[in-house]
Amino acid sequence: MLFRSASGPHAATFARLREQGLDIRVVEGGIGAASAVKMCYAALTKGLMALASQAFASASRLGVAEALRTELATSRPWVLDEADKGLPKVPPKAYRWIAEMEEIGATFAAAGFTPDLFEAVADVYRQVGAMEPGPLKDADQYAERLLAALTRRPTAAD
């Protein structure tokens, strides 16, 4: 998906690019409107993957992974499906998402909110970036590999 902001006659020009097969979404508004949509969209999609990273890894470490999976399958099956399909795709992208999460924090700060939440999400993606590469089948395998990466991380005492 490619977000571009345009208004007036420029919106019509961008809209015509759809005829060439490009997935263009015109966002009405001034400069920065499309970037704001992109940041808010990524906050939800990539933020959910960061939450799922910590939730599944923590559940695994605490011995309640199967109970979490059962609860999600019953009450929020779409979340379980998103985690099982999405988390295995995250590690090769994590290094790129760190700066994006920091940018989301700055965007939210400009809207009057604390940037702390997405600075912490950037830290989650730093941890994910330390995972060993290789295929993963679901959220449970992802969690185990993330926990292994956390175990290998050097500490301040090293």
Where are these regions (language model features)?
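Electropositive, surface-exposed helix/loop patches at the edges of structured domains
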Residues: 22-31, 102-116, 151-157
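Helical "substrate-binding/catalytic lid" subdomain
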Residues: 37-139
